[in-house]
């Protein structure tokens, strides 16, 4: 079995790909089936959230596997009013709902109760099968980089 042990930060020619939903992209130890049918084991550092386009490699550095975010059942909220979108984010965040936040659009795992709540605020909510890339939040690794020199702790 192929064991994928690290995320490669520099682009590499991929040898295969793996399509995973977000619930599998947050796991550091899991068995997966590559898109070419081979079995692989993820043995990655804990706290790593795999993103669409990430490249994983084995210890030998001779396999480079591209991560593809699977289409998932999501609710999609589109709104041109930043205040209403912020209000939706607040209410969903208050319920600890993982959110994908984009300009004018939110996505979360489909939930008809949450859909109805947002519709009561006058927002349009649609159902779709799309890749789901939530904000890292609780999924975030303990180590991360900042582009400034301020000292602070997390």
Swiss-Prot record:
Keywords: Chaperone, Cytoplasm, Nickel, Nickel insertion. It holds the Pfam family UreE_N. It is found in: Cytoplasm. GO terms for biological process: protein folding; protein-containing complex assembly; urea metabolic process. GO terms for molecular function: nickel cation binding; unfolded protein binding. It comes from the Bacteria. One of its GO terms (cellular component) is cytoplasm. Involved in urease metallocenter assembly. Binds nickel. Probably functions as a nickel donor during metallocenter assembly. Belongs to the UreE family. This is Urease accessory protein UreE. It comes from Escherichia coli O157:H7.
């Amino acid at each position: 079995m192929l064991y994928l042990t690290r995320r490669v930060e520099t682009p590499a020619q991929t040898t295969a790909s793996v399509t995973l939903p977000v619930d599998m992209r947050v796991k550091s130890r899991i068995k997966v089936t590559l898109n070419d049918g081979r079995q692989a084991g993820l043995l990655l550092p804990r706290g790593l959230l795999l993103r669409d386009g990430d490249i994983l490699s084995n210890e030998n550095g001779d396999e480079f596997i591209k991560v593809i975010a699977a289409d998932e059942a999501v609710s999609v909220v589109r709104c041109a009013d930043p205040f209403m979108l912020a209000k939706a984010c607040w209410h969903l965040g208050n319920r600890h709902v993982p959110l994908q936040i984009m300009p004018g659009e939110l996505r979360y795992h489909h939930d008809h109760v949450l859909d109805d709540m947002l519709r009561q605020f006058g927002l349009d909510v649609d159902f779709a099968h799309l890749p789901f890339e939530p904000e890292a939040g609780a999924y975030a690794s303990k180590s991360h980089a900042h582009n400034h020199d301020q000292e602070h702790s997390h």
